[in-house]
Amino acid sequence: MNAPLNIAALRHPSDTALSRHAIDNRHLDALEEEAIFILREVAGAFERPALLFSSGKDSCVVLHLAEKAFKRRLNEATINSASADGSRATAPRFAGRLPFPLVHVDTGHNFPEVIAFRDERIAQMGERLVIGHLEDSMRRGTVRLAHPLESRNGHQTVTLLETIEEHRFDCLIGGARRDEEKARAKERIFSHRDAFGQWQPKEQRPELWSLFNTRIKPGEHFRAFPISNWTELDVWLYIEREGIELPSIYYAHEREVVRRKGLLVPVTEVTPPQADDEVERLQVRFRTVGDMTCTCPVESPAQTASDIVTETLQVTVSERGATRMDDRTSEASMERRKKEGYF
């Protein structure tokens, strides 16, 4: 799966008229089956699991997989009749409820488009959403900022652990993937966290085939990553195949940005331009979505999932390497944060 991509080998004779990139995506069935198995394992092994939902593309994929794992899919006629305005995008595609709530840590610095999408998606599904507010942690004094515009991304670990403790969650399902970053590459699918919420890389449990050790002591919990074995290309192929809705900022749009250290920094109320910055209005999209203070877009004309698949086949820089300022503080910045309890 992580071997060098052989485009010719992926082409299928009957696919040439199906899409612009004509990539054979039949391997997605195996990835989907594995992810659904992991989700059902979580539901069966833990008493109080929850699904982390940031409205990012990976969590949207995991949420879609969870619906496939635990809900009944509606037929086409029911989907069309359930849509009030005739748009399939507003109609639910599954009936039933998930066996766990959704969780979002809101830093207060999220992109407005992402929060609007989150609220619309939750309302459409009728699921329970638990929101941990970083500003509540600030009021409690457990989070203290050096200045009002400081990045809150690293501080959300505190709010996450407080939310876990308050609701007594014993497993959080996340959308992390091994191809994103080297610290995530060595993390297990079922990632054990100690009573302090910390990850100990040297104490990871063996995972033999589909056998997982999910035993925990009081106060401990797990993080489970159903799409750990997926790549960015797999995610976009699956989004295209399944017609998964995403926040609009994942697709090309015009936005004011400034150039800093090789990155395009979006101009927002929490990332204003500095005196020597030259503000440009470019056509961009976001490859990954996080805090406004640390997430950068890339120049792109891609308007659809198919366009993004074509782009992804050609990129040479990882999505986090090209877009995240928080990963550039040191070589081990992600591992350090994960040891402290980060996602």
Q: What kind of feature is each model-predicted range?
A:
Residues N2-F343:
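Nucleotide-activated chemistry modules centered on ATP-dependent adenylation/adenylyltransferase
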